[in-house]
Regions:
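Soluble accessory domains appended to multi-pass membrane transport proteins
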Residues: 30-125, 140
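Membrane-spanning helices that line or support transport/gating and their immediate boundary helices
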Residues: 17, 21-32
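Residues at alpha-helix boundaries and the short loops/turns that link adjacent helices
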Residues: 16, 46, 102, 150-151
Length: 187
C-alpha cells in the first residue's frame, strides 16, 4: 500500500515536471508557426522589454536595453500578452508638455508645429496633432502626437524633448515647477 502511494506520488511529480516542458515545447511550436515576433523585434511581455535575440523551441532569448540576457519560456509567451513594437512600419510618438498658466496657447501651438515641421523624421501623414490636453494644478498641459518610422521612434522622442526645451526657452515660453507656499504661524 505504501509503495503504491510512492509510485503514484512519483508519477504526479513527473507529470508536473513534464507538463511545464511540454507547455514550453508547444509554445515554441506556436511561436515558430504564428510568428508573433522575429529575431530583431523589440517586444514586451510579462513586464520585460527587450530585443529578440534568438527563438528556441523551449524559450525565447531577449536582450534588454541595458544588455541583460533574458530567457522567457515559450509557454508563457504563447499564452500571455506580447507587445511587438517593431511589427508595424510606423509608430506614434506622444509628448505631454506642461507650460505655465498665462502662456499664449496660440504661440505655444505655432511654436510646437514649427519644431515638428523642422524634423524630417516626423511623417506628414497622418498629420501631427497638437492640442491643449489638461489644466493641471500648476501647468497647462499640451499634448503632441506625431508618427515616425518605427526605427526612428526613440531618436525622435529624445531629440524633440531637447529641441522643445531649447526653443521654448528661446521663445520665452515658461515651464512650470511645483511651488509650495508656507504660512508661518504667529506666536
Amino acid at each position: 500500500e505504501i509503495s503504491a502511494c510512492l509510485v503514484g506520488s512519483e508519477m504526479c511529480i513527473r507529470d508536473r515536471a513534464l507538463s511545464g516542458n511540454l507547455q514550453n515545447f508547444a509554445g515554441g511550436l506556436i511561436v515558430l508557426l504564428l510568428r508573433p515576433y522575429k529575431v530583431g523585434d523589440l517586444i514586451e511581455s510579462q513586464g520585460i522589454t527587450g530585443t529578440v535575440r534568438e527563438i528556441q523551441i523551449f524559450h525565447t532569448i531577449l536582450t534588454t536595453g541595458d544588455n541583460k540576457i533574458i530567457y522567457i519560456p515559450n509557454g508563457a509567451l504563447s499564452s500571455g500578452t506580447v507587445t511587438n513594437y517593431s511589427r508595424e512600419a510606423t509608430r506614434r510618438v506622444e509628448w505631454i508638455i506642461g507650460v505655465e498658466y498665462g502662456e499664449n496657447f496660440d504661440k505655444v501651438e505655432e511654436t510646437t508645429r514649427r519644431i515638428i515641421a523642422e524634423d524630417k523624421r516626423i511623417l506628414s501623414d497622418p498629420a501631427p496633432f497638437v492640442a491643449l490636453h489638461a489644466l493641471d494644478a500648476s501647468s497647462v498641459n499640451v499634448i503632441i502626437r506625431a508618427w515616425v518610422k518605427s526605427e526612428d521612434y526613440w531618436g525622435v522622442y529624445f531629440d524633440m524633448n531637447k529641441t522643445i526645451y531649447s526653443v521654448f526657452n528661446k521663445e520665452g515660453i515658461g515651464f512650470p515647477f511645483p511651488q509650495l507656499t508656507v504660512h508661518q504661524a504667529k506666536d
